[in-house]
Amino acid sequence: MKVLRTYYIFLLSSIVISQENEAIKYEDLYERKGLIYASDQDSTFNGTVNENWPTGIKKLSYTYKNGKPDSKWSDWFNNGQPKEEVEYSNGIKNGLHKKWYKNGQQKFERTYKNGIHDGKWTEWYENGQSMVEGNFLDGKPDGTWIYWYPNGQKREEGNPVSSDTSSLAFLNDGIWNYWHPNGQLKETGNYISGEKDGQWFEWHDN
């Protein structure tokens, strides 16, 4: 009897382990009141969902904790190149958010702190040239931001401002400089809360 009881316990344990290891697809998840559940579970979903493209190349890897996004989420293009990575904590972005073009060139890199932008913000063109570089502090643009043309020439430079931490709609403020695509200075002047103020100077490209 002791041997049978041991075998029975082992069998039950095997069934539980088999159920826990059974692959859950992203399409099997659903949202209820802002939390994620698996279609065959009553409690919020805990675990990682992994899926591949039909070719066998990895497509996505998402982790949930108590029904909320958690840890690093990753997506890949069907050619195997990384597409996007987002770091979550308790359902909100907290850490780095990266995205790539299909050719493998990075598209942007942003930093979040408790769901709002905080830290360096960088964007690139598909050819690898810098597009935008700036910084956030507590959800608002901080300091000088620089923008470039696809050919690598500087396009504009100045200090944007914003009063809304949930919006990326900025207002130019202070001295701003603009350049032509050939690198020659185009325009310079002062802004006050998005409105041009005082004397502005302009130059034609040669």
List where the protein language model places each region.
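Bacterial Sec-dependent N-terminal signal peptides
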Residues: 1-22
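Glycine/tyrosine- and acidic-biased, solvent-exposed loop/turn segments at the edges of beta-strands
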Residues: 16-206
